[in-house]
């Protein structure tokens, strides 16, 4: 299947890269291991950018102007970076977790959950500059070369893509992209990204004290671990007082009279901030689901929909709740709505397809799950397509689909292995 082919291709790139030895880090000027060429690095980032966005919530489509603003700030910083020729891209994700990430070749994302924690454009520049360094200094690539990421992908280990009991499993290349985005950086990588990110900020005209303020905020937040959401930020970008101290020393050395951009930032964030009560209600619904208070969760998600009826993720969550409450027909209407609002999102098509399968609409199930798997392959997707193949008397297809699903762990992989064994006996 495609995910296995892609992972073999990555493994082959690594093996071929053994011929290249060492190279100079384009940011630090230091010699480092180089098993992956620049062209391979760029291909990897391009291949994984959209699937990784999808597994992390998809694009924040309600306010495209916000993404344009973030992109413009990012481009200012990229232009003064040590690798200005990289094909940088910047996107805002519809994810309440305060985090940002960078894939190889400068494919960068920032969650709306982090944007609402910021106070001005200079702080945004601090975040983006930091991520630009991670990409420019090839930090993720270095981790791949030491086997810290690629091994997990080749092993076929799935990754949960939603923080709920209904979370599906991304497989193969899609799982590897998420691993790249959410991998924990070491302290040396973080210090390096802080240092050069601040220099990029100053070169682009921003006040470097914004980086100090942001790191101080993260240190304070980490002390209390105010919510599970913060775990993601602090696991991928661990804060420390040492980082605060170093940032402060560098900011004082470079001077702190740069641009802050509070007014323009607040203007650009106005729409998102106005919709925050709706996302708070959605987050409350998630918490209620985790506590198995499903009726309260339904009340909260209904509140979210009333506050922002154009948000697809609200309908998708209500559809999940209605399915749990044994109302599949009503759930189907919500999944239809989610797909109509954001047809590019794999998860909504997958959810609608699984709902259709449960209702016996095999044609819609097959179409939706196939489309979802083209975007982000999932174990549950392969499993249900295998079930459909069995019901359509396509034994060879069923064997291939079950075999792919069987690579996953958990109950889905176990069910696939059981059904595969039954087919083999037949």
Residue ranges and their predicted role:
Residues 290, 324-325, 358-359, 391-392, ...:
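Register position in tetratricopeptide repeats
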Residues 307, 341, 374-375, 408-409:
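Structural marker of alpha-solenoid helical repeat scaffolds
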């Amino acid at each position: 299947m495609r995910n296995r082919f892609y992972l073999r291709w990555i493994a082959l790139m690594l093996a071929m890269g053994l011929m290249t030895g060492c190279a100079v880090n384009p940011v630090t000027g230091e010699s480092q291991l180089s098993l992956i060429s620049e062209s391979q690095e760029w291909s990897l980032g391009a291949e994984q950018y959209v699937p990784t966005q999808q597994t992390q919530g998809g694009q924040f489509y309600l306010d495209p102007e916000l993404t344009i603003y973030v992109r413009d700030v990012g481009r200012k910083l990229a232009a003064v970076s040590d690798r200005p020729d990289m094909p940088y891209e910047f996107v805002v994700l519809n994810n309440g977790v305060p985090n940002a990430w960078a894939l190889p070749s400068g494919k960068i994302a920032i969650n709306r959950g982090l944007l609402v924690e910021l106070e001005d454009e200079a702080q945004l520049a601090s975040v983006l500059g930091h991520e630009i360094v991670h990409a420019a200094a090839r930090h993720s690539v270095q981790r791949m070369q030491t086997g810290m990421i690629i091994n997990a992908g080749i092993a076929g280990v799935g990754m949960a893509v939603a923080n709920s009991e209904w979370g599906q499993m991304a497989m193969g290349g899609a799982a590897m992209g998420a691993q790249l985005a959410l991998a924990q950086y070491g302290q040396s990588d973080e210090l390096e990204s802080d240092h050069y990110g601040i220099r990029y900020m100053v070169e682009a005209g921003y006040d470097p004290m914004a980086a100090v303020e942001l790191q101080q905020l993260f240190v304070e937040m980490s002390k209390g671990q105010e919510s599970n959401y913060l775990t993601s930020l602090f696991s991928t970008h661990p804060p420390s007082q040492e980082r605060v101290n170093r940032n402060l020393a560098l900011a004082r050395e470079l001077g702190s009279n740069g641009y802050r951009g509070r007014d323009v930032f607040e203007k650009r964030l106005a729409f998102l901030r106005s919709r925050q009560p709706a996302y708070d209600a959605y987050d409350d619904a998630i918490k209620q689901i985790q506590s198995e208070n499903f009726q309260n969760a339904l009340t909260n998600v209904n509140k979210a929909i009333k506050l922002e009826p154009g948000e697809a993720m609200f309908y998708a969550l209500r559809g999940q709740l209605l399915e749990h409450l044994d109302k599949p027909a009503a759930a189907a209407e919500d999944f239809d709505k989610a797909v109509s609002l954001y047809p590019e999102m794999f998860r909504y098509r997958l959810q609608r397809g699984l709902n259709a399968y449960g209702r016996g609409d095999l044609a819609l199930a097959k179409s939706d799950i196939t489309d979802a798997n083209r975007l982000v392959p999932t174990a549950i997707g392969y499993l249900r397509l295998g079930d459909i193949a069995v019901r359509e008397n396509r034994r060879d297809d069923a064997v291939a689909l079950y075999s792919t699903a069987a690579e996953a762990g958990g109950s889905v992989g176990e069910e696939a292995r059981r059904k595969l064994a039954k087919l083999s006996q037949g």
